[in-house]
């Protein structure tokens, strides 16, 4: 009798995606982050579901409901901190996953890459709205500052902001709708992730060399299932170390103060994973210009296939491009640091230089490096 996993309509899909899938024999640990992102997403949905059972999305009770979860609900504290720090792990995996895609030229799978960019935007939107829910000082002022950026849009800006707010300021209506969106978006992300995977399996995985691996494929199970389990264990270990030993390490102390519209915190800043984009936003003195730079800093990923001038797909055998890539990584780390600093000298000029460098590297220097390498190889 033929195995049920190959005949059953539902099992067949799972089999072709996770068991009998032909995978390149040489994919490194950088290919683990896709499965880790899936684990993060499941973990966030589960912890979020249990948090939603006790949370109230009302300005009068939101802050105290989070306190109630931590103090009175059985294991509420661990669920809350797993959710908050799970978001950080999610973004660490996301950035490494995107970085892998840039380094090894995975962006040449156009559909997979573009859905990935949409996934990145959706995840950022979800995380932003989730940060507003505890209704602390940084929640309130973060929501006010970021939603206010939309007022820079000509003609419709002010109306758009008031429409999103559901009033003339960030208030009860805003909190309620943010909770509704924060709840629904992860399920949309799950659907998009399935489409992401569907398009990936149309072409098959890339590999570190960037060369076709059709001649040398191995089954996904057991080789990559065991490898993914190791990655998952390390991810959970890192998350639990963070949750149990330093749960507030990546948070802002200001968020332990209930939201007060009459008192502005000295330094308004988002969570660490948005700081690079926040630094780019702040480095431009013009409001609309800043907003455009902020959006373009992520949207520029869509242009990567067009900016690929090399005759080789991967950076594995391209030392000049490798150098440029790591300068870009260093630049992003610099921007992340600057985003968390106050707006004063010398941080302003460092932020402006790092922002210019970011766009210069992606739009000019990296394509130039690829062209130089082509010429050196007489291609």
Swiss-Prot record:
Residues reported in the UniProt entry to bind heme b b562: 83, 182
Subcellular localization(s) per the UniProt record: Mitochondrion inner membrane
Entry's Gene Ontology BP terms: mitochondrial electron transport, ubiquinol to cytochrome c
Superkingdom: Eukaryota
Main localization category: mitochondrion
A GO CC term attached to the entry: respiratory chain complex III
Residues spanning the membrane: 33-53, 77-98, 113-133, 178-198, 226-246, 288-308, 320-340, 347-367
Cofactor(s) demanded: heme b
Residues bound to heme b b566: 97, 196
Record's cofactor remark: Binds 2 heme b groups non-covalently.
Family per similarity comment: Belongs to the cytochrome b family.
Other observations noted: Heme 1 (or BL or b562) is low-potential and absorbs at about 562 nm, and heme 2 (or BH or b566) is high-potential and absorbs at about 566 nm.
Identification of the protein by name: Cytochrome b
Organism annotation: Beatragus hunteri (Hunter's antelope)
Organism lineage: Eukaryota, Metazoa, Chordata, Craniata, Vertebrata
């Amino acid at each position: 009798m033929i195995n049920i996993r190959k005949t059953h309509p539902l099992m067949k899909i799972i089999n072709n995606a996770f068991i009998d899938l032909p995978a390149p024999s040489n994919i490194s640990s950088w290919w683990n982050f896709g499965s880790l992102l899936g684990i993060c997403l499941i973990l966030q949905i589960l912890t979020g579901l249990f948090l939603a059972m006790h949370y109230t999305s009302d300005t009068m009770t939101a802050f105290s409901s989070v306190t109630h979860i931590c103090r009175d609900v059985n294991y509420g504290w661990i669920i809350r901190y797993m959710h908050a720090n799970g978001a950080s792990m999610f973004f660490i995996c996301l950035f490494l996953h995107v970085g892998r895609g840039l380094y090894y030229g995975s962006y040449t799978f156009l559909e997979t890459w573009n859905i990935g960019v949409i996934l990145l935007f959706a995840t950022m939107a979800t995380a932003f709205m989730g940060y507003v829910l505890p209704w602390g000082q940084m929640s309130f002022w973060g929501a006010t500052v970021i939603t206010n950026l939309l007022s820079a849009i000509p003609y419709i800006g002010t109306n758009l902001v008031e429409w999103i707010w559901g009033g003339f300021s960030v208030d009860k209506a805003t909190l309620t709708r943010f909770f509704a969106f924060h709840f629904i978006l992860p399920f949309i992300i799950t659907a998009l992730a399935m489409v992401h995977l569907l398009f990936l399996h149309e072409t098959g995985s890339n590999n570190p060399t960037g060369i076709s691996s059709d001649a040398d494929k191995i089954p996904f199970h057991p080789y990559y299932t065991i490898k993914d389990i190791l990655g998952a264990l390390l991810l959970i270990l890192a998350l639990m170390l963070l949750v149990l030993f330093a749960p507030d390490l990546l948070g802002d102390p200001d968020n332990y103060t209930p939201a007060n519209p009459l008192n502005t915190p000295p330094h308004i800043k988002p969570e660490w994973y948005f700081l690079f984009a926040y630094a780019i936003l702040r480095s431009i003195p013009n409001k609309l210009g800043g907003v455009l730079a902020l959006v373009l800093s992520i949207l520029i990923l869509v242009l990567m296939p067009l900016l690929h001038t090399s005759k080789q797909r991967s950076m594995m055998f391209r030392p000049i491009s490798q150098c440029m890539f790591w300068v870009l990584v260093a630049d992003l780390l610099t921007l992340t640091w600057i985003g968390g600093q106050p707006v004063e000298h010398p941080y302003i000029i460092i932020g402006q230089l790092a922002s210019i460098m970011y766009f210069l590297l992606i739009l000019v220097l990296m394509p130039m490096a690829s062209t130089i390498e082509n010429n050196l190889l007489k291609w």
